[in-house]
Amino acid sequence: MQLNSNEIAELIKQRIEKFEVTSEARNEGTIMSVQDGIIRIHGLADCLQGEMVELPGNRYAIALNLERDSVGAVVMGPYADLQEGTKVKSTGRILEVPVGEKLLGRVVNTLGQPIDGKGPIEADGYEPVEKIAPGVIERQSVDQPVQTGYKSIDSMIPVGRGQRELIIGDRQTGKTALAVDAIINQKDSGIKCVYVAIGQKNSTISAVVRKLEEHGAMENTIVVAASASESAALQYLAAYSGCTMGEYFRDRGEDALIVYDDLSKQAVAYRQISLLLRRPPGREAFPGDVFYLHSRLLERAARVNADYVEKFTDGKVKGQTGSLTALPIIETQAGDVSAFVPTNVISITDGQIFLETDLFNSGIRPAVNAGVSVSRVGGSAQTKIIKKLGGGIRLALAQYRELAAFAQFASDLDESTRSQLEHGQRVTELMKQKQYKPMSVAQMAVSIYAVEKGFLKDVEIDKIMDFEESLQSFMASEYAELMAEIDKTGNYNDDIDAQLKAALEKFKQTQSW
């Protein structure tokens, strides 16, 4: 068979015409070293700070150090199989996480991937984990309450929507219990919740999720889990991921509550990353920007005005303000609030709830130290009835602590001192509350009214808890309308005062406690 040169030329032409070449401009680099989850990359010329770098096997690293000849990046996940000479690509994207209503009721990791075995999540969209906080003009003052369900907090240290209230204390003082109860109390308030677990045991996170499910609060809560077994990078970024998920609701004119449990472990994870990246250490070996680490996170919790919401939603939502309330948790060592991270977070937040080991061990739970706990903006958000009735609670407790210390040395006390001590004891006893038993505004008002108006003077100290329990069931059955009215309006006037007085006098006659 003889080949014709024209046929060959024609075949070659056809082949050339069919040949498709697709070219893409890609910024590639080479791994120079892998050490403790940190990779140094040569050749990524146009890399952004915080950019996602694509690694083999559908994994990513985040570029944190941009140096003259190399990029220092921290690997998100396992890194044992990465080797020198491996090619990596820059994506041109900052880390984003899924957001939306579909995340409610789910447990996700730092990257927003479900880890609860309930299938994939159809997100409404993706948002960057690092965002700039709303400016001064876009904010609105805090004047609506977040009810935690705790008498001691809602009466003395009230939290408002859009506030940052720090929960601080040693280990095993009930910090997580307080935050979880605050979430449980929001199940009927319309406030969406985000619980961010940083550096905790998987068993602890599982127990929290189980409790939220038991009390029906999981369906309006997102749990973001970065357990102790996760890499330092995922623990450091978890708080920002959770904040982005909470901001979704804030920016659409809804109210959200976020708990960071806890920021001490986040700071330790960030210190680990910074030291591995060879950044110069400062006080307690923390890097110089550890204040900025927490301030840029907590400033994103805010109450935004209706104009901001309208602009953000392109006019779909009008006349509604949005809020993100933050309850960051800090663990202290032997009550040392003057350490680096605690002082930083105290100065950033709008107040703190200080929990004490001695109070906790003596059976006063929640173990709130009323003397040093403060809410800097919550007073204007407090419910009227609680504000009016609860004014004397803090004073009674402060005087009681002072007099109790003095009374140890004095043998005979005058009548006024003795009555102050007895009143303080009763207030202290009444402020005790069991876990997972949050109270409504009306229930709190009744209890506080009883102690403030002297109805507990003739009740023995060890009977006060029983007295309160019987009183609440009596009010629920006999005065349901009054309780519903107080819950609905939160108002306090002469009529309500008279009704409460009559109710308590009637209850005292029953002697049913």
UniProtKB/Swiss-Prot annotation:
Binding site for ATP: 169-176
Reaction(s) catalysed by this chain's protein: ATP + H2O + 4 H(+)(in) = ADP + phosphate + 5 H(+)(out)
GO cellular component: plasma membrane; proton-transporting ATP synthase complex
Membrane-topology descriptor: Peripheral membrane protein
Class of enzymatic activity (EC top level): translocase
InterPro entries, per database record: ATP_synth_asu-like_sf (IPR023366), ATP_synth_asu_C (IPR000793), ATP_synth_asu_C_sf (IPR038376), ATP_synth_F1_a_nt-bd_dom (IPR033732), ATP_synth_F1_asu (IPR005294), ATPase_a/bsu_AS (IPR020003), ATPase_F1/V1/A1_a/bsu_N (IPR004100), ATPase_F1/V1/A1_a/bsu_N_sf (IPR036121)
HAMAP family documented for this protein: ATP_synth_alpha_bact
Protein name in the entry: ATP synthase subunit alpha
Record organism: Idiomarina loihiensis (strain ATCC BAA-735 / DSM 15497 / L2-TR)
